Amino acid sequence: MAMDGYLWMVILGFIIAFILAFSVGANDVANSFGTAVGSGVVTLRQACILASIFETTGSVLLGAKVGETIRKGIIDVNLYNETVETLMAGEVSAMVGSAVWQLIASFLRLPISGTHCIVGSTIGFSLVAIGPKGVQWMELVKIVASWFISPLLSGFMSGVLFILIRMFILTKEDPVPNGLQALPLFYAATIAINVFSIMYTGAPVLGLSLPIWAIALISFGVALLFAFFVWLFVCPWMKRKIAGRLEKESALSRASDESLRKVQEAESPVFKELPGAKASDDSAVPLTSLAGEAAGASEGTSAGNHPRASYGRALSMTHGSAKSPISNGTFGFEGHMRNDGHVYHTVHKDSGLYKDLLHKIHVDKGPEEKPAQENNYRLLRRNNSYTCYTAAICGMPVHATFRASDTSSAPEDSEKLVGDTVSYSKKRLRYDSYSSYCNAVAEAEIEAEEGGVEMRLASELTDPDQPHEDPAEDEKEEKDSAEVHLLFHFLQVLTACFGSFAHGGNDVSNAIGPLVALWLIYKQGGVTQEAATPVWLLFYGGVGICTGLWVWGRRVIQTMGKDLTPITPSSGFTIELASAFTVVIASNIGLPVSTTHCKVGSVVAVGWIRSRKAVDWRLFRNIFIAWFVTVPVAGLFSAAIMALLMYICGFVSSSR
């Protein structure tokens, strides 16, 4: 059959396919390196470079098998034998519908499934062109089932692996020995899965024809050699590196303790003067001095304990963008107090949230008077956002009455600084960063005692019998120790590369599957598409994916890597390995699972195991809703384009 008259459709298909690959790169590649960027093991630029290499390689070696399912597994192409041009128009419509919806989703920073898009678009044009009989509904049922199986399976595998790692490594007093012993096993598992995937799926491309037992044996042998190399060279090097890091941290800790001792009697930077006091007045007494004197007069309390404990907790519990003159952390109370009794801290004007923060402050201007048991003893979780600074803003109206001691003056001569009662009210200032709340609000309580003032931050110095959240426990859940960070640092990079490789093999078919069908129909003049998928078309799709990643990828990386749950190198390694293993297995059997579902399932499972409050369930709900919306929306776009092409070009429906 002469196809020269439809060359314009092929050219249009190549252009749209590149746009579709661009949208896949902008949206779905965040699944691969989002957690690595979120945990801080790689920068965004490094992630883009590594993803470009492994996405392209994976698309060439693994993309052909899944592409066959996308091309011929969803609709019955034999029904288009008499109207080949209708099928070609349908492939163009499918690419348009999928590309439009993915670009919209990327603009809105919604992580959606590229597989869902192309499946929905394919069904959409088929319903217009040939009616319900053109869809292989049983195949669609299997695909829909895989959308639920993949996050559950990936989440289960990630959860089990993380529990084992936490049990044998993370919770140990000294995690280094067990971690070093497990390193060869972790590397071997990663390499074995990767080699098996390449040999099993990419063997035809490499000109190899091996039985599965031979491929498994080769994969096991390569993994064993790699494990021996890690045990012989990497483990001793890692042990020396960890020892050096711990020695440096010990020296810094000793220096920090010495600095704190020197400033124990100095003026605290939290409150340089109490509200209402004048600079020239004798009543402007440093808070730490008052606390120390009060502590000295109290039973069973040493004179130096309170100020140091209070100030130390302030340093350890707050995280923001300003530098403290004393602490070696990222935030210290380097604010200043005004006469309204509030402590103010600087928010960078270029952070992109300056106006929004001012609006929030204006909205929250009215005081919230709540019972102490509801307001106190809370530390809002910090969720680092990719596009903003995390600010620590204390809204602390201070009302304190000072009564001089009996030896200094009479009670009637004591100066009333602010009021006759002690009250504490709190404003919770929160601001949106797209889909996340980025908060780190330190709470403070100023209370008057006989002979002085005691400062307490959050719930650190309160009654231990009072039921409240333990911020220290939350902090343990969110951070790896220095040695654990080093152990899993490169492992997460390796597994991220592995995940990118698997993503390229699975998702390039979403962009190139319809183009491959269009090209083979044009070259062969029929709908059978018996020829193998051309490698250069897979490479073309890989280039489009990488372009989308570099231009727009950072928009969705934020959601997967930072907003859904806090990521550490240990949890990131678990998420990457288990989800990538699920995707590769699915790719090898030709099942077009969603990498988004696998990664989201792993992220949520590990985050829930670490802490139920660590997962942004609101964001997860939105992602879950998007899974159901994508298929019909992409199908509607595709159906509309197909109806338009059939009307303009006069194509005849194959159902007639």
Curated annotation (Swiss-Prot):
State the similarity comment: Belongs to the inorganic phosphate transporter (PiT) (TC 2.A.20) family.
Kindly state which keywords UniProt assigns to this record, in alphabetical order.
Cell membrane, Glycoprotein, Host-virus interaction, Ion transport, Membrane, Phosphate transport, Phosphoprotein, Receptor, Sodium, Sodium transport, Symport, Transmembrane, Transmembrane helix, Transport
Q: Which residues carry this modification: Phosphoserine?
A: 253, 256, 259, 268, 316, 385
InterPro entries linked: Phos_transporter (IPR001204)
Q: Does the keyword Ligase apply?
A: no
> What induces or represses its expression, per the UniProt entry?
Down-regulated by high phosphate diet.
GO MF entries = phosphate transmembrane transporter activity; sodium:phosphate symporter activity; virus receptor activity
Residues linked to a glycan: 81
Tissue expression pattern: Kidney (at protein level). Widely expressed with highest levels in liver, heart and brain.
> Which parts of the chain does the record assign to the membrane side Cytoplasmic?
27-46, 108-109, 164-190, 235-483, 553-572, 611-622
Specify the protein name: Sodium-dependent phosphate transporter 2
The subunit structure is: Homodimer.
The record's function comment reads: Sodium-phosphate symporter which preferentially transports the monovalent form of phosphate with a stoichiometry of two sodium ions per phosphate ion. Plays a critical role in the determination of bone quality and strength by providing phosphate for bone mineralization. Required to maintain normal cerebrospinal fluid phosphate levels. Mediates phosphate-induced calcification of vascular smooth muscle cells (VCMCs) and can functionally compensate for loss of SLC20A1 in VCMCs.
Q: Which residue ranges does the entry give as Extracellular-facing topology?
A: 1-5, 68-86, 131-142, 212-213, 505-531, 587-594, 644-655
From the UniProt record, give one GO term of the biological process aspect: phosphate ion transmembrane transport
Annotated Gene Ontology cellular components are: apical plasma membrane; brush border membrane; plasma membrane
Return any one Pfam family short name: PHO4
